[in-house]
Amino acid sequence: MITLIIFSFLSFLLGIILSFTAYKFRSQEDPIVEIVNELLPQSQCAQCGYSGCYPYAKAIVENSEKINKCIPGGTDLISAISSVLSIEVPEKNLIITHKKQKNNTVLINESNCVGCSKCASFCPVDAIVGAPNFIHTVLQEFCTGCNICLLHCPTNCIEIKKETYEE
């Protein structure tokens, strides 16, 4: 019984020490970065030139990065970010940072698809549907053309047909 009391007291004491340490050494992030990050679509598609939505939000706030690089967010996102940051909406609606898809069609070759579901599990916007061990298909209206599914397909049955243009 005394062992239980000692361990309870030590656990309580360590909890207080950890709480104080976490409070004292917490990260001092800018709350505006969090607000901008919440506005972004969280598709982590990297079409803006950054590895994900949070690094792009941080660059917008801290480095004055252009706010019109998020392709999936579109013009509504540009308006929302400009109102949060109290800046003007840029004249050019969207900036395409790399060679990107204007009209893309993602096709899954059904004869090669083994139904492993890897493409669907890695799709950041859930544009690929299908059940394990069955053929999968792409919902074109949700697909952002990020090519992540292409990288994870073990049978190379995903094909992206696209028209491209440069900025």
Swiss-Prot record:
InterPro entries: 4Fe-4S_dom (IPR007202), 4Fe4S_Fe-S-bd (IPR017896), 4Fe4S_Fe_S_CS (IPR017900), Elect_transpt_cplx_RnfB/RsxB (IPR010207), RnfB/RsxB_Proteobac (IPR016463), RnfB_subfamily (IPR050294). Binds 3 [4Fe-4S] clusters. GO terms for biological process: electron transport chain. Residues 104-133, 134-163 form the 4Fe-4S ferredoxin-type domain. Signal peptide: none annotated. [4Fe-4S] cluster 2 binds at residues 113, 116, 119, 153. Keywords: 4Fe-4S, Cell inner membrane, Cell membrane, Electron transport, Iron, Iron-sulfur, Membrane, Metal-binding, Repeat, Translocase, Transport. GO terms for molecular function: 4 iron, 4 sulfur cluster binding; electron transfer activity; metal ion binding. GO terms for cellular component: plasma membrane. Residues 28-87 form the 4Fe-4S domain. PROSITE patterns: 4FE4S, 4FE4S_FER_1, 4FE4S_FER_2. The complex is composed of six subunits: RnfA, RnfB, RnfC, RnfD, RnfE and RnfG. Part of a membrane-bound complex that couples electron transfer with translocation of ions across the membrane. NCBIfam families: rnfB. This is Ion-translocating oxidoreductase complex subunit B. It comes from Buchnera aphidicola subsp. Acyrthosiphon pisum (strain Tuc7). The gene is rnfB.
